[in-house]
Structure formats: structure tokens, C-alpha cells
């Protein structure tokens, strides 16, 4: 059609990539309250769409689209739950962008060096306690580099290292060892 201009936002393209491709990255999660020193937690994440698998120290979590698996190596315990939206977003902040983008005011701007796009989502209404969500995406590849989530006085930042889209499809569930205590709370 002549004269038709279609503008595709970076956020829309990024969300499509998350739905269609498998993202894998190491990260450092930093959590800070206004008066406290920040705490850092290293980990790794693999995700596609709503499904994800992440590891942080002695904790592993996975979501297969229905069941949340939370494993603690310290207690050798695996909890199975049907998570709420809030529990999913607390486990994987990318899900906020996937689930809530339509309910937010969205702005996009180039970083000072022009190599990234900074996407800010501000909920129009109180949404799961989140006041602001900022995502930094590498231009061209649409790989996420950083996510910042503000909830009241708490700021959580997820800085990704070596993000890539992979072709190997991982299992988005955790299988217990024979000695693992399984606590099935899916009722």
C-alpha cells in the first residue's frame, strides 16, 4: 500500500524475540533499599516466552508455562507450585515486560553512545507494586543488557553478561533426585 508507514517499536521487536528465541545469559542481580547497601547475587538464566530456568547460588527455579519448580540445595527440597503473576515476575523480571507492556506508558530513547535502546515502562495503574521498569537492549541484536525494577523504595537491577540467543531448547522443569524432598503445593 502506497503511503502506509508502519513503525515497529524496539520493545515490540524485543518481546517478539523473547517469544520466538531462547535467551541465555549470566547475570548479577543487585537489590538495594534506599538506606541499605546493595546486595549482589550472581546467577544464570535461560528463557523462551514465559518459560524459564534460572540459577542463583544454591537456589534453582524453573517455570514450564504452568508449574513453578523451586529447588534449594541447602535443604535438598523441591517445591512445586502454580505461581501467581507476582511470583513469576519476582522470579523473572522479563515477564513483567511480556505481560504488562500493554498496561504501561512506554518510552524509548537511544543511549548516549547510540548502541543501546533504553525502554521505560511506567504502569498506568498500581501494578504488582512496580513503579517503574527500565530495560536496556542492544541495538541490532535485541539482546537485553540490563533490567531495573523499582518497587517503592526498593530497586532491583539485573545486569546480563554475555547474553545470546541459542538454538538448543533446554528443559524448563527440575527433576528431583531420589533423596530430594518434594513438596507439591499445586492444589
Please annotate each region the language model reported:
Residues 43, 52, 59, 104-108, ...:
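Residue-level detector of beta-strand structural context in well-folded domains
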Residues 38-41, 55-57, 64-65, 128-133, ...:
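Short, surface-exposed coil-to-beta transition loops
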Residues 7-26, 38, 67, 71-131, ...:
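Flexible, processing/modification-adjacent segments and terminal tails
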Residues 1-39, 46-51, 176-187:
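N-terminal leader/targeting segments and the immediate start of mature chains
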Residues 27-29, 53-57, 118-125, 145-150:
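Short beta-strand segments that buttress and anchor functional surface loops
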Residues 44-91, 151-156:
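An acidic-aromatic
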Residues 113, 124-131, 139-187:
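Non-transmembrane domains of secretory- and envelope-associated proteins
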Residues 46-48, 109-111, 136-140:
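Short beta-strand micro-motifs enriched in acidic
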Amino acid at each position: 500500500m502506497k503511503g502506509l508507514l508502519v513503525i515497529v517499536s524496539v520493545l515490540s521487536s524485543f518481546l517478539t524475540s523473547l517469544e520466538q528465541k531462547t535467551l541465555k545469559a549470566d547475570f548479577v542481580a543487585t537489590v538495594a533499599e534506599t538506606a541499605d547497601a546493595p546486595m549482589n547475587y550472581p546467577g544464570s538464566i535461560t528463557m523462551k516466552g514465559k518459560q524459564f530456568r534460572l540459577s542463583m547460588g544454591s537456589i534453582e527455579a524453573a517455570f514450564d508455562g504452568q508449574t513453578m519448580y523451586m529447588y534449594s540445595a541447602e535443604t535438598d527440597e523441591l517445591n512445586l507450585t502454580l505461581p501467581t503473576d507476582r511470583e513469576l515476575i519476582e522470579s523473572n523480571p522479563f515477564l513483567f515486560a511480556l505481560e504488562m507492556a500493554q498496561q504501561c506508558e512506554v518510552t524509548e530513547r537511544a543511549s548516549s553512545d547510540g548502541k543501546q535502546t533504553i525502554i521505560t515502562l511506567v504502569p498506568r495503574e498500581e501494578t504488582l507494586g512496580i513503579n517503574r521498569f527500565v530495560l536496556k537492549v542492544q541495538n541490532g541484536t535485541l539482546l537485553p543488557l540490563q533490567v531495573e525494577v523499582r518497587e517503592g523504595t526498593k530497586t532491583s537491577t539485573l545486569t546480563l553478561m554475555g547474553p545470546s540467543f541459542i538454538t538448543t531448547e533446554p528443559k524448563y522443569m527440575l527433576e528431583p533426585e531420589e533423596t530430594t524432598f518434594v513438596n507439591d503445593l499445586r492444589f
